[in-house]
Amino acid sequence: MKLTILLLVAALLVLTQARTERRRVKSRKTSSTYDDEMATFCWSYWNEFQYSYPYTYVQPCLTLGKACTTNSDCCSKYCNTKMCKINWEG
């Protein structure tokens, strides 16, 4: 009887741990994809308007619903990502 209970508890622990790990991996994938999309979005905006509106990151950030009060590099978190640098360098 005790052995059965121990086996059940062990099985539950294994299942719980596997579930947690799956959730952790899933959230990591989601944020990575989001960051890549954001980097591409910000880079495209910068590339298109760099001659007429240099350093203007306000518009894309407002489009994304981010509060942005100054003209400072609002999207620098995304524009400094690896994907954005690859795009920028060609």
UniProtKB/Swiss-Prot annotation:
Expressed by the venom duct. Disulfide bonds join 61-75, 68-79, 74-84. Its main location: secreted. Residues 1-18 form the signal peptide. The modification Glutamic acid 1-amide is found at residue 89. GO terms for cellular component: extracellular region. Residues 19-29 form a propeptide. GO terms for molecular function: toxin activity. Keywords: Amidation, Cleavage on pair of basic residues, Disulfide bond, Knottin, Neurotoxin, Secreted, Signal, Toxin. It is found in: Secreted. It comes from the Eukaryota. Belongs to the conotoxin O2 superfamily. The presence of a 'disulfide through disulfide knot' structurally defines this protein as a knottin. The cysteine framework is VI/VII (C-C-CC-C-C). Probable neurotoxin. This is Conotoxin Im6.2. It comes from Conus imperialis (Imperial cone).
